[in-house]
Regions:
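Conserved beta-sheet core of the metallophosphoesterase superfamily
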Residues: 129-227, 231
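Acidic carboxylate-rich catalytic motifs and surrounding loops in phosphoryl-/glycosyl-chemistry enzymes
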Residues: 78-84, 119-122, 223-227
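Short, basic, glycine/proline-bearing loop/turn elements
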Residues: 1-5, 48-54, 127-135
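Polar, enzyme-active/binding microenvironments
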Residues: 9, 23, 223-241
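A generic local structural motif
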Residues: 15-18, 65-66, 118-124, 144-148
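Short acidic low-complexity segments
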Residues: 109-129
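Core catalytic region of metal-dependent phosphoesterases/phosphodiesterases
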Residues: 6-114
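Active-site metal-binding loops of divalent metal-dependent hydrolases
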Residues: 2-5, 33-36, 83-85, 135-137, ...
């Protein structure tokens, strides 16, 4: 699942991805981070009316509801840290006396344990040789797939990430003759409503999408699923409109 940044998510696209998750009952649901925007506690809101909007509780409840709908039919669910969810910790840094309160640790703040979601503070290797990351751990590249591939080269393993809001796959092969290996960098797009992303001023090289991964116990086959601007898409032979 790509960056939602709730409550700035694309409602139709989100509902359709939930329909897909309920229909397919995936073994695992992986969320690349930025599931909640935390816009009222961002550094960009400081000194603006946004910082005084009392929406944090409602945003959290909506995020919990959407994550539950996305993951309730899966055997397991995982989320990795991200720059937007780090905003809670960054806010606590301004009041260090609150930092050790367990209820203000992000995974407890979101009550992931009750939902059966496992939160990872760093890379998560979800299958052998395949890592889930957010995508902000290295330098970003304007070309879809290359931010993930650069992370993959550093990690020595294939990487699935978000952060760039781009949908793309790139690969790198090394070796001699028949003795070679290929690693992949996959960026999963985003599920944001671009109209609500006012900071882009309406112009952004973003693509909505998700990725479905098939693992046969040895090899991974990625299926890139582009999502249209109206929130519709086709996946695994079925259209969601």
């Amino acid at each position: 699942v790509s960056d939602l940044q709730i409550p700035l998510n694309h409602e139709v696209a989100t509902k359709n991805v939930i329909k897909l998750a309920r229909r397919e009952k995936f073994d695992s649901v992986l969320v690349v981070g930025d599931e909640i925007d935390f816009q009222t506690i961002s550094k960009w809101s400081e000194g603006t009316p946004l910082a005084y909007e009392q929406t944090l509780h409602a945003d959290r409840e909506l995020t919990q509801s959407i994550l539950w709908d996305l993951t309730e039919n899966a055997r397991e669910a995982h989320i990795v840290r991200s720059n937007h969810t780090d905003r809670l910790y960054n806010t606590l840094l301004k009041v260090p006396g609150l930092m050790n309160l367990p209820e203000l640790q992000y995974e407890k703040f979101m009550d992931f344990a009750t939902m059966g979601i496992q939160f990872h503070k760093t890379f998560y290797e979800f299958e052998k040789g395949w890592i889930l990351a957010h995508g902000d751990e290295g330098n970003t590249n304007p070309n879809p797939g290359l931010t993930a591939l650069n992370l993959a080269k550093k990690a020595g393993k294939s990487v699935v990430c978000g952060h760039t809001h781009k949908l793309g796959l790139s690969a790198y092969t090394e070796g001699v003759g028949a003795n070679y290996r290929t690693i992949y960098g996959i960026e999963v797009g985003n599920l944001m409503d671009k109209k609500q992303a006012s900071y882009t001023k309406g112009i952004a090289n973003w693509q909505m999408g998700i990725v479905i991964l098939d693992w046969d116990g040895k090899n991974m086959t990625p299926h890139m699923i582009p999502i249209n601007k109206d929130g519709s898409f086709t996946a695994l032979g079925k259209s969601y409109v």
